[in-house]
């Protein structure tokens, strides 16, 4: 008489029932399901951390913004800047210079309301791809806020404060006024603040007297004024000019032929020595 070995019975914790031991496919399915649940849990926790961090920086940034406008109210910003000696109004700026600045610094300047999600997303993609985290996505309005209301230190709370200020500035002023304030307060290197000082200091001219090549090279300096100053690094200033020209072509403010002609003029530019 043969003995039949009884089938092994186990308790399945997944189905919560008794039965034969799970096979290989069942085990793999259980492992994959566990890993999927673990991944979803990690992603959910990461999302919660991001939301909490975003909320923290938004609240902290708004406090910084409120503190800044106690010192310099938004509604007094234009009168404060436009009353300065050497202020250059929009009507006295060459169109080539205006086009060059917008192309180089904020190509969507006329379309956004102070903060540009498209530029921020594009800058983030560039930063992640290069690993440099050099692109900030700041609009001209945000740069104006940074230069007039805040310190130059870089941290997320200050970036949030800058955004709050930019939105408030856009509600208070039109685009021409914002552009005026921006170009009259930015630093051009060699001790020159504002387009009026820069045009006079580098070329001995008023902004309207600038040639197109001179206007374009000045538009590129504020990106890194100490590095691009024509007095100390004329070659770098010309290289930066080429970047601006390429962006003007990309924004359809110049044809490639016009840009090449201006680039050829760069080698003939005469800069006044630093005073």
Where does each model-flagged region fall?
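Juxtamembrane regions of bacterial inner-membrane/periplasmic proteins
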Residues: 3-275
């Amino acid at each position: 008489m043969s003995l039949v070995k009884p089938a092994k019975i186990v308790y399945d914790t997944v189905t919560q029932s008794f039965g034969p031991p799970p096979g290989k496919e069942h085990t793999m399915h259980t492992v994959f399901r566990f890993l999927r649940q673990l991944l979803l849990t990690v992603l959910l926790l990461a999302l919660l951390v991001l939301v909490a961090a975003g909320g923290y920086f938004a609240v902290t940034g708004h406090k910084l913004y409120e503190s800044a406008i106690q010192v310099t109210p938004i509604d007094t910003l234009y009168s404060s800047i436009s009353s300065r000696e050497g202020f250059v109004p929009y009507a006295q700026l060459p169109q080539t210079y205006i086009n060059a600045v917008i192309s180089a610094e904020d190509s969507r300047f006329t379309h956004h309301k102070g903060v540009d999600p498209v530029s921020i997303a594009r800058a983030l993609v560039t930063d992640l791809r290069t690993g440099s985290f050099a692109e900030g996505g700041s609009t001209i309005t945000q740069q104006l806020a940074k230069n007039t209301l805040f310190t130059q230190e870089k941290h997320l709370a200050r970036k949030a404060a800058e955004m709050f200020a930019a939105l408030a500035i856009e509600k208070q002023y039109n685009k021409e006024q914002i552009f005026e304030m921006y170009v009259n307060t930015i630093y051009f290197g060699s001790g020159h603040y504002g387009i009026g000082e820069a045009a006079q200091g580098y070329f001995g001219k008023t902004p309207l007297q600038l040639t197109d090549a001179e206007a374009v090279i000045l538009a590129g300096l504020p990106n890194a004024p100490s590095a691009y100053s024509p007095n100390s690094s004329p070659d770098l200033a010309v290289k930066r000019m080429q970047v601006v020209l390429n962006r003007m072509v990309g924004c359809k403010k110049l044809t490639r032929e016009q840009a090449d002609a201006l680039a050829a003029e760069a080698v003939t530019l005469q800069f006044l020595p630093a005073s």
